[in-house]
A protein has these predicted regions:
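Hydrophobic ligand-binding cavity/cleft-lining segments
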Residues: 1-48
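Hydrophobic-ligand binding "helix-grip"
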Residues: 31, 57-105, 109-111, 143
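Short C-terminal domain-edge/linker segments immediately following a structured domain
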Residues: 39-43, 51-54, 73, 85-88, ...
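Positively charged, low-complexity intrinsically disordered regions
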Residues: 11, 51, 64-66
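A conserved amphipathic terminal alpha-helix motif
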Residues: 111-146
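Residues that form or flank phosphate/diphosphate-binding pockets in enzymes
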Residues: 14, 88, 115
Length: 146
């Protein structure tokens, strides 16, 4: 099994703390930036930052599955680990530019399937997920008024 990785990055004209505060809000803010690939989104525990547990159904590229993620945060990095698989999503927000903006990266990694299916997964899943993540970052920018 090879590790599969996908990511998208966008610079925003918004301070890092404002971006992080938005991303920590799993009840009100986070659902606003999800694409139609995410359904049955719910907060199971907490709702703000560290310790929050969320669930959703994700469908893309002819595949569907359920996720149950636990939020962890350290040094401006918000990580969400799936209880049901090796999937991890990571939001990294760092200062960018001279005007107090931010660079926001949404990344995912997981253990890919073995065999020929794993080869195709490693080639095509990152492309599709990168497109979806770019849309999420566009929605984040719009939600933050940039």
């Amino acid at each position: 099994m090879a590790k599969v990785n996908a990511h998208a990055t966008r610079e925003l004209d918004v301070p890092t703390e404002r971006v992080l505060e938005f991303l920590r809000d799993y009840r009100e803010a986070r659902p606003k930036i999800l694409t139609g690939n995410y359904t049955a989104y719910r907060v199971e525990q907490g709702g703000h930052g560290q310790g929050t547990v969320i669930g959703y159904h994700f469908a893309a590229g002819g595949r569907e599955r359920d996720y149950r993620l636990r939020a962890q945060e350290q040094d401006g990095v918000l990580q969400e680990r799936d209880d049901l698989s090796s999937f991890v999503s990571t939001w990294t927000v760092v200062p960018a530019g001279n005007g107090g903006g931010s660079s926001v990266t949404l990344a995912a990694s997981w253990d890919g399937a073995g065999g020929i299916g794993g080869i195709f997964e490693g080639l095509f899943a990152p492309l599709g997920l990168r497109r979806i993540y770019a849309q999420i970052l566009d929605r984040l920018a719009a939600a933050l008024g940039t």
